[in-house]
Amino acid sequence: MQTFSTWKVVCLTTFLLFGGIWALALVLPSGDNSKLQALAHAPIALFIGVGVAVYVLEGLVWTVGAIELGARLARSPRLGAAVGVGGYGLLSHWSGGSSSVIAATWIALVLNCSYLTLRQRCKRIAILSTVGHKLAYFLMAAYVVYTYGA
Protein backbone atom coordinates (compact mmCIF):
# COMPACT_ATOMS: atom_id res chain seq x y z
CA MET A 1 0.00 0.00 0.00
CA GLN A 2 1.36 3.37 -1.02
CA THR A 3 1.63 5.97 1.72
CA PHE A 4 1.58 9.69 1.12
CA SER A 5 3.49 12.26 3.11
CA THR A 6 1.56 14.37 5.58
CA TRP A 7 1.94 17.48 3.44
CA LYS A 8 0.53 15.70 0.40
CA VAL A 9 -2.50 14.60 2.41
CA VAL A 10 -3.05 18.12 3.76
CA CYS A 11 -2.68 19.69 0.30
CA LEU A 12 -4.98 17.11 -1.28
CA THR A 13 -7.53 17.72 1.47
CA THR A 14 -7.41 21.46 0.81
CA PHE A 15 -7.80 20.93 -2.93
CA LEU A 16 -10.71 18.51 -2.53
CA LEU A 17 -12.44 20.64 0.10
CA PHE A 18 -12.34 23.97 -1.72
CA GLY A 19 -12.39 22.54 -5.25
CA GLY A 20 -15.37 20.38 -4.39
CA ILE A 21 -17.28 23.29 -2.87
CA TRP A 22 -16.49 25.42 -5.93
CA ALA A 23 -17.70 22.66 -8.27
CA LEU A 24 -20.85 22.14 -6.18
CA ALA A 25 -21.55 25.89 -6.30
CA LEU A 26 -21.56 25.66 -10.09
CA VAL A 27 -23.89 22.65 -10.21
CA LEU A 28 -26.29 23.03 -7.28
CA PRO A 29 -29.09 25.59 -7.20
CA SER A 30 -28.35 28.59 -5.01
CA GLY A 31 -29.89 28.54 -1.57
CA ASP A 32 -31.77 31.17 0.36
CA ASN A 33 -29.82 34.42 -0.01
CA SER A 34 -31.82 36.22 2.69
CA LYS A 35 -29.66 34.47 5.30
CA LEU A 36 -26.54 35.71 3.52
CA GLN A 37 -27.83 39.30 3.60
CA ALA A 38 -28.75 39.02 7.28
CA LEU A 39 -25.27 37.74 8.14
CA ALA A 40 -23.66 40.55 6.15
CA HIS A 41 -25.26 43.10 8.50
CA ALA A 42 -23.99 41.40 11.65
CA PRO A 43 -21.06 43.03 13.46
CA ILE A 44 -17.90 41.40 12.15
CA ALA A 45 -16.47 40.77 15.64
CA LEU A 46 -19.62 38.89 16.66
CA PHE A 47 -19.73 37.01 13.35
CA ILE A 48 -16.11 35.89 13.65
CA GLY A 49 -16.32 35.17 17.39
CA VAL A 50 -19.37 32.96 17.11
CA GLY A 51 -18.34 31.50 13.75
CA VAL A 52 -14.89 30.39 14.89
CA ALA A 53 -16.33 28.70 17.97
CA VAL A 54 -19.06 26.95 15.97
CA TYR A 55 -16.73 25.73 13.22
CA VAL A 56 -14.11 24.46 15.67
CA LEU A 57 -16.79 22.63 17.67
CA GLU A 58 -18.26 21.14 14.48
CA GLY A 59 -14.84 19.81 13.51
CA LEU A 60 -14.20 18.41 16.96
CA VAL A 61 -17.63 16.80 17.32
CA TRP A 62 -18.40 15.44 13.83
CA THR A 63 -14.86 14.49 12.82
CA VAL A 64 -12.57 13.97 15.80
CA GLY A 65 -15.25 12.95 18.30
CA ALA A 66 -17.17 10.67 15.97
CA ILE A 67 -14.08 8.86 14.70
CA GLU A 68 -12.46 8.48 18.11
CA LEU A 69 -15.73 7.26 19.67
CA GLY A 70 -16.14 4.79 16.83
CA ALA A 71 -12.59 3.59 17.38
CA ARG A 72 -13.06 3.26 21.12
CA LEU A 73 -16.61 1.89 21.37
CA ALA A 74 -17.00 -0.13 18.17
CA ARG A 75 -13.30 -0.62 17.40
CA SER A 76 -14.04 0.86 13.99
CA PRO A 77 -12.85 4.38 13.22
CA ARG A 78 -14.44 4.05 9.76
CA LEU A 79 -17.84 3.47 11.34
CA GLY A 80 -17.29 6.59 13.43
CA ALA A 81 -16.34 8.50 10.27
CA ALA A 82 -19.55 7.37 8.58
CA VAL A 83 -21.58 8.48 11.60
CA GLY A 84 -19.77 11.83 11.53
CA VAL A 85 -20.52 12.34 7.83
CA GLY A 86 -24.16 11.48 8.34
CA GLY A 87 -24.45 13.57 11.47
CA TYR A 88 -22.84 16.66 10.00
CA GLY A 89 -24.35 16.34 6.55
CA LEU A 90 -27.87 15.25 7.39
CA LEU A 91 -28.62 16.11 11.01
CA SER A 92 -26.90 19.49 11.12
CA HIS A 93 -27.93 20.78 7.69
CA TRP A 94 -31.26 19.16 6.81
CA SER A 95 -33.16 22.41 7.33
CA GLY A 96 -31.07 24.16 4.65
CA GLY A 97 -32.42 22.06 1.82
CA SER A 98 -30.76 19.61 -0.54
CA SER A 99 -27.95 21.97 -1.58
CA SER A 100 -26.94 22.48 2.03
CA VAL A 101 -27.04 18.75 2.78
CA ILE A 102 -24.95 17.87 -0.29
CA ALA A 103 -22.33 20.55 0.42
CA ALA A 104 -22.11 19.68 4.13
CA THR A 105 -21.84 15.98 3.34
CA TRP A 106 -18.98 16.70 0.93
CA ILE A 107 -17.16 18.76 3.56
CA ALA A 108 -17.58 16.05 6.20
CA LEU A 109 -16.56 13.29 3.79
CA VAL A 110 -13.33 15.06 2.81
CA LEU A 111 -12.40 16.04 6.37
CA ASN A 112 -13.21 12.62 7.85
CA CYS A 113 -11.24 10.76 5.17
CA SER A 114 -8.32 13.11 5.73
CA TYR A 115 -8.55 12.60 9.50
CA LEU A 116 -8.60 8.81 9.08
CA THR A 117 -5.48 8.99 6.90
CA LEU A 118 -3.57 11.39 9.14
CA ARG A 119 -4.69 9.63 12.33
CA GLN A 120 -2.51 6.66 11.41
CA ARG A 121 0.54 8.92 11.60
CA CYS A 122 -0.26 11.26 14.47
CA LYS A 123 -3.56 12.19 16.13
CA ARG A 124 -2.31 15.67 16.98
CA ILE A 125 -1.56 16.45 13.32
CA ALA A 126 -4.92 14.98 12.29
CA ILE A 127 -6.76 17.19 14.79
CA LEU A 128 -4.81 20.30 13.77
CA SER A 129 -5.47 19.59 10.10
CA THR A 130 -9.20 19.18 10.70
CA VAL A 131 -9.51 22.34 12.79
CA GLY A 132 -7.28 24.27 10.39
CA HIS A 133 -9.35 23.27 7.38
CA LYS A 134 -12.58 24.15 9.19
CA LEU A 135 -11.16 27.59 10.07
CA ALA A 136 -9.93 28.16 6.51
CA TYR A 137 -13.38 27.25 5.22
CA PHE A 138 -14.96 29.64 7.73
CA LEU A 139 -12.67 32.47 6.62
CA MET A 140 -13.64 31.82 3.00
CA ALA A 141 -17.32 31.86 3.99
CA ALA A 142 -16.83 35.10 5.95
CA TYR A 143 -15.15 36.68 2.93
CA VAL A 144 -18.09 35.67 0.72
CA VAL A 145 -20.65 36.93 3.25
CA TYR A 146 -19.03 40.33 3.72
CA THR A 147 -18.09 40.77 0.06
CA TYR A 148 -21.20 39.56 -1.74
CA GLY A 149 -23.85 39.52 0.98
CA ALA A 150 -24.48 43.25 1.29
Q: What kind of feature is each model-predicted range?
A:
Residues M1-A74, A82-V83:
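Juxtamembrane helix-loop-helix connectors linking adjacent transmembrane helices
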Residues F47-A150:
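Transmembrane helix-loop-helix hairpins at the membrane interface
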